Design a protein with these regions (language model features):
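Hydrophobic hinge/microswitch elements
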Residues: 1-4, 9-12, 87-132
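Short beta-strand-centered segments that line the small-molecule binding cleft or hinge
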Residues: 2-42, 49-51, 109, 132-134
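Short secondary-structure boundary/capping segments
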Residues: 28-31, 56-58, 84-86, 123, ...
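Short helix-loop capping/hinge motifs at secondary-structure junctions, enriched
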Residues: 44-56, 152-157
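Secondary-structure junction motif
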Residues: 48, 64-86, 156, 173
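A late-sequence structural motif
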Residues: 132-175
Length: 176
């Protein structure tokens, strides 16, 4: 069974992908990818000018912000990164917390606010020109994507083969 990030999966799936290694006592986490967090805005003025000028996303944190819910991996990584930059996440002007990335992308593209999300999650809107992305500082903010499974799980033969396939292609894992 998977962590609470997927309540509808409880009892139905033994393997899953998550954005934070939240419970290493009960779950194995195997790192499979890294994803960059960026600040996204609608593709309109004044953001177009700021984008051309190379403005950092950190300079736009005072804008009305639409964020993921507090227990999301993206939100936790964003807050961790901001604290590391000496920025209090509670100082942001959060106007909405939404648990649906599509609703966040759509809201931002319509000009209702800005957000911080992963490049992978914003990719389609960025490629179609509906959104702009701003880097979060010189070194950027990153999160890992993990394959996860319970330590006490009895994996089927197919699940074990899939796990071996992933581990073969991504040999680095999260600390236990």
């Amino acid at each position: 069974m998977l962590p609470s990030a997927c309540p509808e999966c409880q009892g139905k799936a033994n393997l899953g992908f998550v954005g934070i290694a939240a419970n290493p006592k009960e779950y194995h986490y195997h790192s499979v990818a890294e994803d960059r967090l960026v600040l996204i805005t609608p593709n309109r003025e004044p953001y177009q000018t700021l984008h051309r000028q190379g403005t950092s996303g950190l300079d736009l944190l005072d804008r009305p912000m639409i964020l993921r819910e507090e227990n999301s991996g993206t939100r936790q990584e964003m807050e961790r990164y901001l604290r590391k930059q000496q920025i209090d996440p509670d100082s942001m002007n959060v106007i909405a917390q939404i648990d649906n990335p599509e609703a966040i992308r759509s809201s931002v593209s319509r000009g209702l606010g800005v957000s911080i999300m992963s490049v992978l999650a914003a990719r389609e809107y960025l490629l179609s020109g509906q959104l702009l992305s701003f880097e979060l500082g010189d070194q950027g903010a990153y999160r890992k994507i993990y394959l996860t499974w319970r330590k006490d799980a009895q994996l089927s033969a197919a699940e074990q083969k899939f796990l071996a396939f992933v581990k073969d292609r991504h040999p680095v894992t999260a600390p236990e």
